[in-house]
UniProtKB/Swiss-Prot annotation:
<dbReference type="Pfam" id="PF00453">
    <property type="entry name" value="Ribosomal_L20"/>
</dbReference>
<keyword id="KW-0687">Ribonucleoprotein</keyword>
<dbReference type="GO" id="GO:0019843">
    <property type="term" value="F:rRNA binding"/>
</dbReference>
<comment type="similarity">
    <text>Belongs to the bacterial ribosomal protein bL20 family.</text>
</comment>
<keyword id="KW-0694">RNA-binding</keyword>
<dbReference type="GO" id="GO:0000027">
    <property type="term" value="P:ribosomal large subunit assembly"/>
</dbReference>
<dbReference type="InterPro" id="IPR035566">
    <property type="entry name" value="Ribosomal_protein_bL20_C"/>
</dbReference>
<dbReference type="GO" id="GO:0005840">
    <property type="term" value="C:ribosome"/>
</dbReference>
<dbReference type="InterPro" id="IPR005813">
    <property type="entry name" value="Ribosomal_bL20"/>
</dbReference>
<keyword id="KW-0699">rRNA-binding</keyword>
<dbReference type="InterPro" id="IPR049946">
    <property type="entry name" value="RIBOSOMAL_L20_CS"/>
</dbReference>
<protein>
    <recommendedName>
        <fullName>Large ribosomal subunit protein bL20</fullName>
    </recommendedName>
</protein>
<dbReference type="GO" id="GO:1990904">
    <property type="term" value="C:ribonucleoprotein complex"/>
</dbReference>
<dbReference type="GO" id="GO:0003735">
    <property type="term" value="F:structural constituent of ribosome"/>
</dbReference>
<keyword id="KW-0689">Ribosomal protein</keyword>
<comment type="function">
    <text>Binds directly to 23S ribosomal RNA and is necessary for the in vitro assembly process of the 50S ribosomal subunit. It is not involved in the protein synthesizing functions of that subunit.</text>
</comment>
<dbReference type="GO" id="GO:0006412">
    <property type="term" value="P:translation"/>
</dbReference>
Amino acid sequence: MARVKKGVTARKRHKKVLKLAKGFRGARSKLFRPANQFVMKALRHAYVGRKLRKRDFRRLWITRINAATRINGLSYSKFISGLKLSGIEMNRKVLSEMAIHDKEGFAQLVETAKQKLNA
């Protein structure tokens, strides 16, 4: 049986890592070991970042909705409570977009929520 050496496989793996390390500075993009370490770290950061992005956007949407509801004379929590009571199921992303681009429609939603809270 022939002896199998890992030259081709290692070269492929090294090239793959160095390709991912493109744009890193210094040895982190030129040498395999530092590149491999920082690519692994970068991938971990990217994974965490994808989770954080969801939280950040939800926080942004809530902040926008809160600002718009306060302009219309209601707090965010009361607005959401009123929407739930009136059976309107819109997610925060859509509500945020409405608050920015369709102020009249959003004002109607706030009025609906107010009526349900007072009823």
